[in-house]
Every structure is written in structure tokens, then in C-alpha cells.
Amino acid sequence: MFDVFSVVGLLATGPVAPVVESESGSLLFKILGSIVVGAPVLLFVVLGIASLLRDRPLSERTIVSFVQFGIAAGLVAAVAMLIFMLAWNDTQVPIEFGSWVHVDHNHDDEADHYHFVFKFEFDRLSVPFVILTFVLCGTIGAFANRYLHRERGFNRFFVLFSLFVAGMVTTSLAGTVETLFSGWELVGLSSALLVAFFHERPAPPSNGLHVWIVYRVSDAALLMAAVALHHMKGEGNFDKFLTGEWPAGGTLLSPNSAFFVGLLLLIAAMGKSAMVPFSGWLPRAMEGPTPSSAVFYGALSVHLGAFLLLRFSPILEQSPTLQGLIVAVGLATAVFATFSAAVQTDIKSALSFASLSQVGLIFAEIGIGFRYLALIHILGHGCLRTLQFLRAPTLLYDYRTMEDAIGERLPKISGAWLSRSPDSVRVWYYRLALERGYMDAYLKDYLVRPFLWTLRKCDSFERRWTNMLTNSGPAKERAPEAAQNMRSFYE
């Protein structure tokens, strides 16, 4: 396949290319990589500490200045990293920041039983994705400055926003499964909190809880995959189970091990990217502010599951069954999102389902093996959907202005096949789309309720056993408050 990095690198190795010692190049890469990773982390630390100073809070102008400087520094360093990688024909640049955990075997010194290296990987996949993150987050930050002007939660929004940027950068550049999981958790936490941003109303916290529950399922699957990889290889460094450079790499795992780990990774990606049957949380996430809807669920966070599959694509390709499952999930999600978008009455929900249909196609491309096509699709779709979300608040005004200018109502566009269908088919289609394929009802009846019933039974048994051992009277048997809230949320 055509390799832009290699072609440009070969051109740069001519007589005009600078000759740089490897030590100097490594030092430069480490400095630039430290800026890319450290800028959003430092931004979060500064804004987080400042938010704790209630007596002297930062002004809106100061907060925006910090955000602009932090994102601009990270973007410049990422672009500089890309330029030097092209010029020196480096398609993979690992950067390590030391070993945080190091446990040896008791019987020999041949290998480590557990080895946690804080490592980042700059390659053909991570560099474009992290540049996209900085570009879109910078755009959203400038938009949010005006959109949230004089809002009560202005400072809170940008604290969570900086946490999201740090999580996205960490996940994108992760070179170990532990580093990836830490960034994955930061993205999920900031996303759920921003869905519940307007906590004065009952709907945003409830929808934020729904998003958090789905993310917990996704996080559990990713954690199980990380534990399995540690059990198989002794550490989470990608080099221990992935060979070669992306996208032409391979895996050192056996087919059975690859299928098990790949299935867990697929579940994690499905939850993060709202694939069927976890698609119900995406329209609920629109309760958050428009800037967070644009950057999270329209451009970046919703693509994180696809990025995870691209990163571990050599493992997925070990199993044709797993690849077929990815294609099936992606196509089913695309079809589901297409007919659900047709009945939405607000533009943000319609755009969320439009994003979901494209992410479903991206999953199908990954399952087929079109890795570069999937990456290009992510980059283009993220930019387009961000523009549409930012345009949404003024679209209705412009729509009415256009109707006033032409003196009549604009015609409504509907599917040609649907307009020619019998009334019974159209009613059935509308009901199915309005109920979102009844997926939420099925999940509630066949997954959530049995799960909560099991937990309540375990809680009741534990209370009886405790009362018997302590010879105390019968305590009031009830589920904990958190379980009660979860039950009322789903019922």
C-alpha cells in the first residue's frame, strides 16, 4: 500500500537532507514528545488547582489564555515531531519515561514478573490522531469561550475539558496497555461529568449516569484484556505482543489467545464508540453543552473505539471470525443509526446518529482490513462533524431566514423508498426508529434487571449471614442507596 511516510522520507535522505547524530535526534524527539504529553497534563493541573482557590478564582480571560497556550504548545510540538519524522525517515519513535513498577521472579533473573513502563509511541497511527485531537480541541476551546460566556460552570467546563485533552493524548500515544488504560479512564470520566454538566436539571445527571454505566462495561473489558496480556507476556509493552510497524505489523499471540483478547478489545471498543447494542447512550450524551457534544461524541471520543481496534489490528487479524464479527457489528450499527436519525426532532440528536452511522462504517473498514482507509475516514469525519455541531446553534435561524428570503417553506426531504411504501410499512418503520430498535428495553429486561436482582439477592444473603454471626436482630433489608438509584433509573 502507498506509504506517504516512506516516500517523503526517501526524498528527504538526499544530499540536501540534514545529517543529524542519532543521540541528538533521540534527545529532540524526547523533548518534543514531553511537550506533546505534558502540555495538556500541566494545563489540567493549573486549572484544577486554580479552581480550588475559591477566594481568588481565575477570570474567564485567564482561563482561556491558559487553554489556548497549552493546546497550541502541544499542537506545535506534535507537528514538529511529524516534520522531523518525515525528514529523518523515522516511522516509529518510542519515548520512555522510566519504569514505575518492577517486580522480579523469585527463582531466576531472566525476566520480570511485572514491568510497568510509562511509554509513548509516535507512529503513523498515533501522530495523525493526536494532531487531530489538538486541532479540534483548540477549535472547540475558542468556540466554548463565547458559547459559555458568563455561565456559572465556565471554570468547571474547562477543567474537565483539559482532563479530556490529557486523556485523549495519553490514549493516542500510549505504548503500553497500562498507559492506554489510564488515558481511556480519563476520557470516560471527563465525558460522563460533562454530560451531567447542567446538574440543576434532572435529565443531565441521569443521562450522565447512563453513559458512565456503559463506559464501566467498556472499561471492564479493556481491563480484562490488559490482565490477559500481562498473564500471557509478563508485561503490557506493545512490543511484547505486536511485531513490526503499523499498519503492516503482526502479533506474537497464538490464534486462540488472539481471539480471546481481541473479543475483549472489541467489547471495549463497542462500548466506547456506542456500537450496537450499546448505542443508547449516545443521544443521551447530547444533554451536555454543545462544545462538549462536538468534541466528544461527534469527533474524538466516539472514534476512540475505532482507534483501539486499529492499534491492535494485528491481533484481530489472527481470527477471521473476529474480523467478520467486527464487520457485522459495524454494518448493523450503520443501519440502526440511519433509520433512527430519520425520526429525530432536534439537530444534535440527528447529528449524533449521523456520527454513529459513519463510525459503524469505520468499524466495517477495520474488519475488512482497510487500515489506512479507516484512519483517513476518522480524520475527515471528525473535522466534518465538529463543523456541523458548532454550526447547529445558528442553523435554525439561518433556515428561517432562507425561507423568509424565498417567500415559502423549504420542501421536506424523505427517502424515496419510504414515501412509496404502504402506510403499514411506514408506521412500522417509524415506530421501530422512534424506539431505537427497542435495544434499551431489551438491555433493561434481559441484562440490567437480572444483574440487579442478583446483586440484591447477594446483599440480602450477606445481611442474613452477618446478623446470624453477630446475633443481632433482623436488619432492614434493602439495597444500598446507589443500587436503588440505579434500579429506579432503569425502571
Task: Say what each PLM segment does.
Residues 2-491:
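...captures the hydrophobic TM-helix bundle architecture rather than a specific catalytic motif
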